[in-house]
């Protein structure tokens, strides 16, 4: 047995997963010279800016990403150094902690000094550009990093190969960008790397992934043609690092002073509130702001599919559901919202918060409210009639006698607002608040 090599018993070394693609795999259309500029701002000073303008060809509004370019020598140096960092730097040193950027730039600086002779034509400004791209691809989101870094963008979506990346802009709503993937394999690899960075798995056997990226952005993706005939797709729902407080919502006009005082009074008395609305209407934002009104000394338990809530409380237990990766169809190891809501009752919470109810967990939530626990949750519905109809129908199956346990329902909608000077903007408004007296008996 001497000299026998068994490489399959060796532990595979972990490598840095750079979110980078080759130039021929992604297209970034240049900014047209005669574009009609509607808005312009920097995301990374000197290196990356956003220009929103009307395309001279189609006349449509386009979100242009304009990044500093690397010349041939700078590109060669970048590829050399990024390859060395990806192979040699310990992932623990370049992870999600606050020292990641510092560690990366320190290593990049060391390697740039080492290879200065090999790349004599690269100037100091050129090395600064290289460091920008290293940080973009090793710590950020690669070609989409500028878009993700734009706080004005709420959603980023890719519908497939040779289709522009679309963004949902706070002022201009859904508009295409000048970026698109040209290669199926490159798009597949990009999704795999995003999933890897979020600690999730995606493959042909498990082609749907729902994960939380660093920065608390929510990733939903489909892999290859398993469930999406056009190939891989993804959408990234962005969230603020500092969530809106109830005061912020009042100042923005989302809710009125009277509404804020009313909700505060309800929460002080451990009442139950349900937030309803359509997709992207701001239900989670309202839910987070309401939960921040709960007394600091109370015990909170939150149950979510992905960790979106961000609360200031110390006495807070956060539960997140887990999908099964079994191949037998038995869902071995899956932990559902229903399981977590049942478990949360053993923690004796003062307030139980469910990110969104849509299944059998609703029944357990109402059981908890019946025993004196405060409750907060969201539900997809356009009005209170549809909301109650969903609650009493399968798969929620909440008894009609439990409906009065909901003290108040708030409807949040996305609306179009006039600008002070010209044009329109998009905002969120609480359109209606109901008190629930009984089944099918509501007061607004």
Regions from the PLM with identified roles:
Residues 1-198, 214:
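N-terminal accessory targeting/assembly segments
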Residues 69-70, 162-163, 172-173, 183, ...:
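Conserved nucleotide-binding/hydrolysis micro-motifs of P-loop NTPases
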Residues 139-150, 195-210, 298, 396-399, ...:
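Active-site phosphate-binding and catalytic loops of NTP-dependent enzymes
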Residues 158-272, 314:
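P-loop NTP-binding catalytic core
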Residues 262-279, 289-415:
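Switch/coupling sub-region of P-loop NTPases
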Residues 283:
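Conserved lysine of the Walker
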Residues 408-444:
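Conserved P-loop NTPase
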